[in-house]
């Protein structure tokens, strides 16, 4: 049996109170949570505010447990606690796991095509294949963006570009927090299908959060289902994506949940999209 890519052992995590704001009190997200995440493509599913982003930050060694431990490919994430101030530690962390933040933005004067070549050249793949770079750009429909800079992109264009960077970087695990929320539905399908291909071909594992249950059902091999009480179930996508289980997690009728998703997509489709997705 394959070793898990991420393991939590009696993990507890709380966000600290903010002294300047009496309304922001200590918030416990996880309390004694233990689980393992298998290799492959894993979707994170659950209501807002149930810990999906917090889990990704913990697994990516961007934040650290209050107690218990998180291991990534057998390495305790506390080994990377100095990554923010020690470039060597940061390099070792990023070799194992990289992170796409929700609403991630950055600006640079360098053309996107040049940045992609640099990221691939300086990344962690042992073998460099120019055709792989060209394929990333083609499959993510980045060809017309290569001469532009990140500051000129629409939200959807930037999301596709950042996904491209993450795949070129060569980390063994890529964590993505809502990586395609700004894309049109057909683009989401193409991006997720491509992520499944890349994971199968390269052995890179991908964990992503998303709200569209239809997409997560088709484009993940495993699922993490987050509940409001702080518990999390991990299993094969087809086993967890069942009416009774989803209703238990979301605490709304299954049909109503899908209706809500449909209305949300209709609302997005009706909105103007400057620059496209």
Model-derived segments and spans:
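H-loop/switch region of ABC-family ATPase nucleotide-binding domains
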Residues: 210-211
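Helix-to-loop junction immediately C-terminal to a conserved catalytic motif
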Residues: 60
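Conserved ABC ATPase signature
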Residues: 149-153
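Conserved ABC transporter NBD signature motif
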Residues: 68-81, 93
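Conserved ABC ATPase "signature" region
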Residues: 129-145
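ABC ATPase nucleotide-binding domains
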Residues: 239, 243, 249-277
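Q-loop/switch helix immediately C-terminal to the Walker
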Residues: 103, 109-122
